[in-house]
Amino acid sequence: MLVKYWMSKKVITVKAGDSMDTAIKLMKENHVKMLPVMKRDKLVGILTDRDLKKASASDATSLDIHELLYLLTKIKISGIMSKNPVTVPEDFAIEETAGVLIENGISGVPVTDPKKGNIVGIITQSDIFRALISLTGVGKGGIQFAFQIDDRPGSIKELTDVIRRYGGRMTSILSSYEGTPEGIRKVYIRMRSIDRVSLHELEEILQGMAKMLYMIDHRENNRKIYS
């Protein structure tokens, strides 16, 4: 899943020489929390709502409302923005981008064209969450089983073959080695199109095939934790 399919393509920017007041208005009008800062069509910084709050708190301690409004028109964005902004190319995968955000402790980044270098979008935590919801299939409801299985060829197929025999249609299959011993993996299978009687029989069979961690039936918000 590439960034270019999930980013916001409408990019609202400000100039380094613009005032803090201008940035506040742009964020409110466009319902954004991050503005790329440009100078001569080149990205020179990032301004976030956090930067604005920090600047307002430090510079407006003892000012009345009129002095504060005047101050907001005088403070330049170049003085409060974060310089040397982190960016990602539009052909980055969503999971790579999530790693960049975590590593740098930021909530979003400008997205660039890898050939031209110009800004083509913005990707934020919210966009990554949307991608995660789509990837897992949780928006489709259904049933999710979580297993701990042997890490060997065919171990996932054995489970999915049984699920298909009971009429289940796979919505998503995810796998992880996080927190597992050598030779073991966790697998999360989301399915739909299975009736409740078949589900009960399927559950018993799967328990005999692998270590089950939990089952969530979103149709009735029924949750079973096995381990």
What are these regions (language model features)?
Residues 33, 107, 169:
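Short acidic/polar active-site loop segments enriched in Thr and Asp
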Residues 1-52, 56-61:
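Basic, Lys/Arg-rich alpha-helical nucleic-acid-recognition elements, primarily the DNA-binding modules
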